[in-house]
Amino acid sequence: MEIANLVLEYIKVLAWPFTVVFILIAFRKEVSKLFDKTKKLELPGGISLEVFEEKIQEAKQIAKEVEKEERPELAEIRKTKEIHIIKTDADVNKRMLELGLKPSPSGLQISYYQELASKDPRLALAGLRIDLELMLKNLAKGFQLEIDTKSSIRQINNELRERGAISNKQYELINKLLQISNAAVHGIEVSEEQANEVFEIMRILVQDYMNWLSWGFP
């Protein structure tokens, strides 16, 4: 029975990306108009059109530092854990379901967002933010943090850093990505090239998250 439930959950997850793509294509003009109406609003995190590109470049620099980080405390934990090989979006969602975590609509595949960006970069970044929030909530659950259901994504990010689940640099990078994606959600103009730069930055965090999934947290 448990296997049957797992399969049903998995099928529902696989259907999500196709549903989202259909909605974006079918109602792209309408959704874009909603974005356009918000352009005059003050953007969160102090991001304006003039500094949006600067934020992306700052995030790229932090991402390089995150990629070079060595975390010996996590290396010790991994030595005692069984390593699960994760290669595809199917593997990702299957593993998350096994660990009692919420699956990802995109299967954490960057190519999924690159495809969306070719239609509407802002919508793609909005979707990326959803996955980023899901990853952080799953990390909090994986590291057994007691998080209030009303906690904001920034509060969760801070709790993860204080617990040592993420490094200071990862914390900084997540905050930068939240600033960038929030600006996109609030209607700032984003080029496909800029969106793809952000996806490559996100790829670093996704890889770290995959590593956590592979050994199943502490």
Question: Language-model segments: which ranges?
Answer:
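Short, charged amphipathic alpha-helical segments flanked by flexible coils
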Residues: 140-170
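Membrane-proximal, non-transmembrane interface segments of integral membrane proteins
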Residues: 37-128
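Charge-enriched, short contiguous segments at helix-coil
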Residues: 171-176, 182-218
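Amphipathic alpha-helical interaction segments
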Residues: 126-130, 134, 155, 197-201
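Extracytoplasmic/periplasm-facing segments of secreted or lipoprotein envelope proteins
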Residues: 114, 120-147
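Non-transmembrane, amphipathic alpha-helical segments
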Residues: 19, 23, 116, 120-124, ...
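Short hydrophobic membrane-inserting helices
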Residues: 1-53, 57-61
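Amphipathic alpha-helical segments in well-ordered regions
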Residues: 30, 134-139, 205, 209
